[in-house]
Amino acid sequence: MMQKLIAQIEKGKPFFEKLSRNIYLRAIRDGFISAMPVILFSSIFLLIAYVPNIFGFKWDKGMEAILMKPYNYTMGLVAFLVAGTTAKSLTDSFNRKLESTNQINFISTMLAAMCGFLFLASDPAKDGGFLSAFMGTKGLLTAFLSAFVTVIVYNFCVKRNITIKMPKEVPPNISQVFKDLIPFSAVIIILYALDLVIRNSFKSNVAEGILKLFEPLFTAADGWIGVTIIFGAFALFWFVGIHGPSIVEPAIAAITYANIEANFKLLQAGEHADKIITSGTQMFIVTFGGTGATLVVPFMFMWMTKSKRNKAIGRASVVPTFFGVNEPILFGAPLVLNPVFFIPFVLAPIVNVWIFKLFVEVLGINSFSVNLPWTTPGPLGIIMGTGFGLWSFVLAITLIVVDIIIYYPFLKVYDSEILDEEEGRKESNSDLKEKVAANFDTKKADSILAASGVSDDAAKASNITEQTNVLVLCAGGGTSGLLANALNKAAEEYHVPVKAAAGGYGAHMDIMKEYQLIILAPQVASNYEDIKQDTDRLGIKLAKTQGAEYIKLTRDGQAALDFVQQQFEN
């Protein structure tokens, strides 16, 4: 029964993979990744300014203003900045389809998108200048609009050579200025015209109009059905081999960051912060220890199973999973594509967000009002993100207990199967391992498990003799770090001239030319055809990995070195 259900879900995989590679969704995601230092930096000052309130201490107004200035001057302009970073990412995607001698200037598109955004989101101040009310999270949807219009117009002009052409004698940097003049002017005229139409028709700026238009959707998304569908999709997509965040995160990005600011404003006013859909909810409630709410799973594998293999996988997975990097348990067990774990893998995140919503609406716990790094351990993220209240400790403990209850019966069934294999009563399920390997890049997890003695593969010496720089890419940089670390450790141990670095897909365009090989982790393997256009143009080798394969490579440094060598032999 479960096998048939999974097979039906997998039939939609090609469509959802195509959706995850959509250049506009990717531009939104990568635009936020580029702006993440601003978002995280600003949250530090929120914590300093308002966490002491929990313990009865309040800064005086002057000191509060000093502490809040870094927040207001960074997060308060985040939409303005994201307009530029989103335009840059989208420009990179369009440039892949253009001739290398006729590319769109991403610096120009960034400037045009940011200038255009000001027309759409700012109002004139009485004493000159302009107001910034919609330049923060309230203006994110408008930032996307400005970025998309900008790059589409630039692409139209550059592709058709609608530019001012200068004599060959003119230096390239001067010639580029005139080449950008027509598309830049067209963007500003179009967005200014839109601004005039909206202001005269609805007596508001475009950003305010868009916010009012989508307000019912934001409200509905925060309801029981909304959070169930949105956060259930994360785990469902991941289970069948699709990187769910690539689809879901861009669609809800504006809601999550707007809700964070709304919650903060409510707390400032002494009211209850009740917005559910936030980045903190996603990272510390729904993906509590990684997609599938797997924080408890490695501990359960260690302490609640009888199989030697399961115990070893649990021990190897505990530390990375505690910090939100759960590939070792996802692909090492495996949990993904494993019919036994389908129900708990999808159900646990949904139940977690239901419990959180009950705590917010019934018990009065404040929802998340600050952005924290995704590698913050789940329980600590809950406590810090919700203001260190007593109920936050209770919530963290409750989620741990509930997730154990959800996973326990399925773990016992799976452990029984593995025990039968170990004792020779049942043949090893190589089909499942091969299926995971075919759908996920498991190198990172393999490396971790190998280092812990889980892998049976013998290592072989590497024949790499020339300096080789390797870039490992995953969705956010955490998973890729496992393989990069395994490569660097093995290279040092065996004196092989390999240097590896980890990165997030989308933030790689400006650095990829420094590497001879790029390896895609399973999370981003579906982007292989897109990035291959870039690597072929630059003469860089490209390799993608699958789930079980990636885990194996992260366990075994020598195997990872062999994998690198094989890419240059093929």
From Swiss-Prot:
Gene3D superfamilies registered for this protein in UniProt: 3.40.50.2300
Pfam families per the UniProt record, alphabetical: PTS_EIIC, PTS_IIB
Positions of post-translational Phosphocysteine modification: C474
Active-site residue numbers: C474 (phosphocysteine intermediate)
Keywords, ordered alphabetically: Cell membrane, Kinase, Membrane, Phosphoprotein, Phosphotransferase system, Sugar transport, Transferase, Transmembrane, Transmembrane helix, Transport
Annotated domain remarks: The EIIC type-3 domain forms the PTS system translocation channel and contains the specific substrate-binding site. The PTS EIIB type-3 domain is phosphorylated by phospho-EIIA on a cysteinyl residue. Then, it transfers the phosphoryl group to the sugar substrate concomitantly with the sugar uptake processed by the PTS EIIC type-3 domain.
Protein function: The phosphoenolpyruvate-dependent sugar phosphotransferase system (sugar PTS), a major carbohydrate active transport system, catalyzes the phosphorylation of incoming sugar substrates concomitantly with their translocation across the cell membrane. The enzyme II LacEF PTS system is involved in lactose transport.
Entry protein name: PTS system lactose-specific EIICB component
Organism whose genome encodes this protein: Staphylococcus aureus (strain N315)
Gene, per the UniProt record: lacE
